[in-house]
């Protein structure tokens, strides 16, 4: 079996560790722990790394299409490898959750998230496993765009790093147990 772990974000140094890139941050942490490096694949429009865990090939994916076109890379990879939707796990930021809170879901709407909207449009379903990481709402009249493309303040950054560790644990648990329902029960709280 093969699994695709896809972190959403925007490519380039300009967006490094911005709120919208928490999905990339988690995928980078998984790659570091597995001691694997990314290579860019022009056909899939993504940076890819892979490793084996319990005989299963795991792909770490960072789409390079920019957030709003993430579905292109996800669809291309699912199609090429002949994978089911159950083999997909998307990790991304959520404005409507407080900073650092995580929520695992097996289905749902885009909730205003353009990366998720693109994935739903390209794969044709809202039913796929996902992990949302809270980045909070904009404060003091800041626009949503400015908020998601800004970096975390010091306190929020510490909280995000802790939540990324928790998501890392949940992803590893999911890969070991091969059961997303059980993973949701354990990590949603």
Swiss-Prot record:
Family per record: Belongs to the PTH family.
E.C. no: 3.1.1.29
MF (Gene Ontology): peptidyl-tRNA hydrolase activity; tRNA binding
Feature type site, description Discriminates between blocked and unblocked aminoacyl-tRNA: 10
Name of the protein in question: Peptidyl-tRNA hydrolase
One protein family per Pfam: Pept_tRNA_hydro
Quaternary structure (record): Monomer.
Positions annotated as active site in the UniProt record: 20
Gene Ontology BP term (one): rescue of stalled ribosome
Record flagged with keyword tRNA-binding: yes
């Amino acid at each position: 079996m093969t699994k695709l772990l896809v972190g959403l974000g925007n490519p380039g140094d300009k967006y490094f560790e911005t709120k919208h890139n928490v999905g990339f941050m988690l995928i980078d942490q998984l790659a570091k722990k597995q001691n694997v490096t990314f290579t860019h694949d022009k056909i899939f429009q993504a940076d890819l790394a892979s490793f084996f865990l319990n005989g299963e090939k795991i792909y770490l994916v960072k789409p390079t299409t920019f957030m709003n076109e993430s579905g292109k890379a996800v669809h291309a990879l699912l199609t090429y490898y002949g994978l089911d939707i159950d083999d997909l796990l998307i990790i991304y930021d959520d404005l409507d959750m407080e900073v650092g809170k995580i929520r695992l879901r097996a289905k749902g709407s885009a909730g205003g998230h353009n990366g998720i909207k693109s994935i739903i449009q390209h794969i044709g379903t809202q039913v796929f496993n996902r992990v949302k990481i809270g980045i909070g709402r904009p404060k003091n009249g800041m626009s949503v765009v400015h908020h998601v493309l800004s970096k975390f303040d010091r306190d929020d950054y510490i909280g995000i790093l802790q939540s990324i560790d928790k998501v890392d644990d949940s992803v590893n648990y999911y890969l070991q147990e091969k059961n997303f329902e059980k993973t949701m029960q354990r990590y949603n709280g």
